[in-house]
């Protein structure tokens, strides 16, 4: 049962109640979003052109995304799978996210899109310490940033 004020607003199973956007509507959340997939409330994303490009994944970036948002720094994230644990926070907080469909390999088009966004940023922050075989294009992005002489920060929480 979901109560708003003194009235029952909605009732049913969690799957019926917690649909995309329902919690935002129920509690009139306007300066952020409730992420149904993660159960987290995220603040409003920073607007503007991304200043920082973040290479993250597997839970390495969510804390950094929130820190950048709190500091008012617009950022982009790539390349993430839509099933990555970092994806809901990236989607909520980043100005731009370059993402592949869940359970699909990253493709050259993802790399090219991410490279274009990354090269327009002033800085790259890499949260990854290991690049596996399914993450080879993110390793190439990191190498591209190094080769171009971009400012790079290695970040771990």
Name each region found by the language model.
Residues 1-16:
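Conserved switch/coupling elements of ABC/ABC-like ATPase nucleotide-binding domains
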Residues 26-109, 126-128, 132-139, 148-157:
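ABC ATPase nucleotide-binding domains
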Residues 110-120:
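Short, well-structured alpha-helical segments in soluble
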Residues 118, 144-146:
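Short, conserved loop/helix-junction motifs that constitute active-site signature segments
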């Amino acid at each position: 049962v979901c109560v708003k004020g003194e009235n029952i607003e909605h009732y049913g199973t969690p799957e019926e109640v917690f649909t995309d956007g329902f919690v935002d509507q129920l509690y009139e959340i306007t300066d952020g979003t409730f992420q149904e997939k993660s159960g987290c409330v995220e603040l409003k994303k920073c607007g503007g052109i991304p200043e920082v490009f973040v290479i993250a994944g597997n839970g390495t970036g969510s804390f950094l995304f929130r820190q950048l948002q709190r500091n008012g720094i617009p950022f982009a994230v790539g390349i993430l799978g839509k099933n990555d644990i970092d994806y809901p926070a990236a989607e909520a907080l980043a100005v731009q996210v370059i993402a592949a469909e869940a359970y699909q390999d990253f493709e050259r088009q993802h790399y090219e899109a991410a490279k274009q966004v990354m090269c327009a940023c002033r800085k790259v922050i890499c949260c990854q310490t290991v690049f596996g075989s399914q993450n080879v294009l993110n390793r190439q992005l990191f190498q591209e940033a190094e080769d171009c002489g971009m400012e790079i920060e290695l970040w771990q929480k």
